[in-house]
């Protein structure tokens, strides 16, 4: 089967959880998978040595992590030579109305344009509100942001909005792009 690199940037942990789930799904399908945090990738990492690459990042304050930008900038030639995909995690992606998700899509499009990367697939992924992990100030700010957006504001619990079935379908579609991938029925 194929060798696949999953690189990610995560500020609060949900993107890391998603990247690990992607890695597990690919491994369960028989692929050789390496999952790395894009902030501190191994010095010898060469995405061009993989049969496919998935990169993920989360949106905060209107952009993805700058180190993910740097990772993609550095490796965009290799990323454009192999099957590749990008997933972007945000609370905006949790909105059921496509018009409400548009700001997140625009951030993805700007990111891809600025980095010169042309992935075969992209996906907006709903993130999580982890009130229990926030300090007081961040908890208050996130509660206010969530409230304005019609989201969950009970800070006594956490909320996960990630659609795992949608993510699995995204990974399955990516897998079909890999060399020696079985044909989809």
Give the positions of each predicted feature.
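FMN-binding flavodoxin-like domain, especially the glycine-rich phosphate-binding loop
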Residues: 57-185
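N-terminal beta1-alpha1-beta2 submodule of the flavodoxin-like/Rossmannoid cofactor-binding fold
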Residues: 1-82, 172-185
């Amino acid at each position: 089967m194929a060798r696949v690199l999953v690189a990610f940037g995560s500020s609060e942990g949900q993107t890391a959880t998603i990247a690990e789930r992607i890695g597990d799904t690919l491994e369960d399908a028989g692929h050789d998978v390496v999952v790395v945090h894009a902030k501190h990738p191994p010095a010898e990492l060469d995405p061009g040595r993989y049969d496919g690459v998935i990169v993920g990042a989360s949106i905060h304050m209107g952009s993805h992590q700058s180190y993910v930008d740097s990772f993609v900038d550095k490796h965009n030639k290799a990323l454009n030579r192999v099957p590749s995909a990008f997933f972007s995690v945000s609370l905006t992606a949790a909105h059921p109305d496509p018009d409400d998700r548009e700001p997140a899509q625009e951030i993805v499009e700007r990111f891809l344009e600025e980095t010169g990367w042309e992935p075969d697939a992209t996906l907006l992924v709903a993130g999580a509100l982890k009130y229990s992990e926030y300090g007081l100030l961040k908890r208050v700010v996130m509660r206010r942001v969530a409230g304005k957006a019609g989201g969950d504001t009970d800070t006594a619990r956490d909320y996960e909005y990630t659609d795992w079935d949608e993510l699995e379908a995204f990974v399955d579609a990516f897998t079909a792009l890999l060399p020696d991938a079985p044909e989809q029925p």
